[in-house]
Amino acid sequence: MTWFTPEVIDVILTVIKAIVILLAVVVAGALLSFVERRLLGWWQDRYGPNRVGPFGMFQIAADMLKMFFKEDWTPPFADKVIFTLAPVVAMSALLIAFAIIPITPTWGVADLNIGLLFFFAMAGLSVYAVLFAGWSSNNKFALLGSLRASAQTVSYEVFMGLALMGIVVQVGSFNMRDIVEYQAQNLWFIIPQFFGFCTFFIAGVAVTHRHPFDQPEAEQELADGYHIEYAGMKWGMFFVGEYIGIILISALLVTLFFGGWHGPFGILPQLSFVWFALKTAFFILLFILLRASIPRPRYDQVMDFSWKFCLPLTLINLLVTAAIVLWNTPAVAVQ
């Protein structure tokens, strides 16, 4: 009797895929910080990082070395266990959420029938990480930043979920691969669910606390917010986690609204990974462009925008989608 049964081999291959994908996401998140700084320098007509290596390409390695050798300091009056746990939860929740993304027809960590619900469960965990960081730091700026972040995230996650319910109503499934295959046979959801796409994209920027929704860490008001007391590798986990969040939301936008790994009109299906990577890179660049071009609004304006504009628009989109699906569904006679 051998240990290497087909079931065991499938488990081993799944674990290998998970390790490769998650390591690639972490490396991409670290590299994205360099890409953002270079693009911001280009768009703002100035030099970006250009001292370390050719074209500054080794700047990220220098930053990582500096971060690694910095003192791993913990405030004396902080709750040390929760203070240490917060960055671990923040980064782990984002990496685990990435497990549901089908990158190609054969590459993906988990094919869950509750894929979308799993994503929202992991997104909810990130709220706890921010609260842990703010409360355990024993710093008023950190606490205020964490309260802002939790209120903003919870508010925008409400209609983030409602924005995707129109897709679920049309497909009849929470499975990510089912959603991608439905788009291959029909229109990409960017067309029938355009308003759902707009509200989901806005919510994605807000949930990742990216500019212009970076109120929880507004330097002018809160002195860097909930991670003001963090240094060294703990701060680095928050820093890289933010870029992993950008990659996650961009990959979700591609999967849910732009056909996933499929090219436009089914062109070159053998280049599934290339299509997925190109579309994801486009949205990552859009995240960076928002930082370079839009001013930061006041916090009350951010919250009013979510409840008074985005939520009604999302509800109208969901109701119209449900009405159209019911209208096109043939009636079933009751025996």
UniProtKB/Swiss-Prot annotation:
**The protein's Enzyme Commission number:** 7.1.1.-
One Gene Ontology cellular component annotation?
A: plasma membrane
Per the record, the GO terms for biological process are: aerobic respiration
Instruction: Give the residue spans that cross the bilayer.
Output: 11-31, 81-101, 114-134, 154-174, 187-207, 238-258, 270-290, 307-327
Source taxon at top rank = Bacteria
MF terms (GO), sorted A to Z: NADH dehydrogenase activity; oxidoreductase activity, acting on NAD(P)H, quinone or similar compound as acceptor; quinone binding
Its record classes its membrane topology as: Multi-pass membrane protein
UniProt main location, coarse: membrane
| InterPro entries, alphabetized | NADH_UbQ_OxRdtase_su1/FPO, NADH_UbQ_OxRdtase_su1_CS
Question: Is this entry keyworded NAD?
Answer: yes
Keyword set includes Transmembrane: yes
Report the top EC class in one word: translocase
Instruction: Tell me the keywords, alphabetical order.
Output: Cell inner membrane, Cell membrane, Membrane, NAD, Quinone, Translocase, Transmembrane, Transmembrane helix, Ubiquinone
Reactions that this protein is recorded to catalyse: a quinone + NADH + 5 H(+)(in) = a quinol + NAD(+) + 4 H(+)(out)
Cellular localization per UniProt: Cell inner membrane
| Quaternary structure, from the entry | NDH-1 is composed of 13 different subunits. Subunits NuoA, H, J, K, L, M, N constitute the membrane sector of the complex.
* NCBIfam families per record: PRK06076.1-1, PRK06076.1-2
What is this protein's function? NDH-1 shuttles electrons from NADH, via FMN and iron-sulfur (Fe-S) centers, to quinones in the respiratory chain. The immediate electron acceptor for the enzyme in this species is believed to be ubiquinone. Couples the redox reaction to proton translocation (for every two electrons transferred, four hydrogen ions are translocated across the cytoplasmic membrane), and thus conserves the redox energy in a proton gradient. This subunit may bind ubiquinone.
Instruction: Give the record's family classification.
Output: Belongs to the complex I subunit 1 family.
Q: What is this protein called?
A: NADH-quinone oxidoreductase subunit H
Gene behind this chain? nuoH
